[in-house]
Amino acid sequence: MERKHNPNSWSDLPHDLLNLVFERLSFANFNRARSVCSSWYSASRQSVPKNQIHWLILFPEDNNNKNNSSCTLFNPDEKDKLYKTQHLDEEFAKSVCRATYGSWFLMVDPLFNLYILNLFTRERINLHPVELLWKDYELGVSSRNRMKSRGGNVRSPVFWIDEITKDYVVLWGLRDWCVFYSKKGDTSWNQIPQTPDCYRLRYKDHKLYFQGYFSSFKIFDLSGEIPQQTFDSLVFVDHCHFRRWVLYSTLVVTLTGKVLNVEKMMDCSFTVFEVCSSGRRIHSLGDESILLEQGITVLANDTNGFIRNSIYFNNDCENIEKHTYDMFIFNLETQKTEPLHTFDSSSFQFSRAHWFVPSFTLT
């Protein structure tokens, strides 16, 4: 006797089998699969997709427009698709994103207060007010100009947060004073001594990498209660003949923890040097790519859409047409620059973009 086919059998698949499938999906496909039916949604709560890749979030250009609070999401692996977030609140529309970690965003509101926001769950963590820090730090300018300059005083903010416990640490530099940090449970901002003239900060695996304006380079261990300095040196790189063409330099921490100094040239090319060693120039990143603004490298493969041995950066070079709203890729092997994606500026305009890793917090 022929067995009658049950068209609804897909909704009754064992959760163990569904979990094996969910773990292999990209974030976009995982999100689609978990919305198929209640049974699949229930199974998805026990899974986290392994193919977690970086997406690009594009913030609207007019932060003063309270009706313009949705953002556009771009997945490098789906170049023909753009996603829109739901409209967020007015405060978010007027805030500026300064850093990302996973699906969490470090935001600065119009009064220069800091908070951490999860884009997908809408969880929010308000950080300690910084008003007392501004009062303690006298700029020697008029009160009006001091208020205008405060936003720029939050230099190179970085942070880390645990998706489950919500333990976190936030760090940033205050002009030529020092680096401040705050962890979950702290009642105020804390100082890290001997960190004046902060230029660039990076944070990875409980280590803070500090670069000063005058070539100083330090590493701090933040795994304990109090930050401990573990390394102190000058950043030495063999770049004397490039110096006059350098727009700026920035630190990058690779997947293996190697520290690089990346210099951006006036023609939008790049040079890469090692830090903490001979300062030799690097000509290949192997199978990794640099996300310049985030100061990290990612593995480049067919799954995540990134091109190996390349640098992904924002459009801020004078010889690239303004207002094209593009992100760019510089290939270290070919020494050529090309757009990551040409966004249609007639449909939307954005002021800045950040890489992040979309994820759900499943409980």
From Swiss-Prot:
Entries under PROSITE patterns matching the protein: FBOX (PS50181)
InterPro entries for this protein: F-box-like_dom_sf, F-box_BR-signaling, F-box_dom, KIB1-4_b-propeller
Signal peptide stretch: none
Matches recorded under CDD domains: F-box_SF
Organism: Arabidopsis thaliana (Mouse-ear cress)
Start and end residues of each F-box domain: 7-58
Transmembrane segments: none
Name recorded for this polypeptide: Putative F-box protein At4g22170
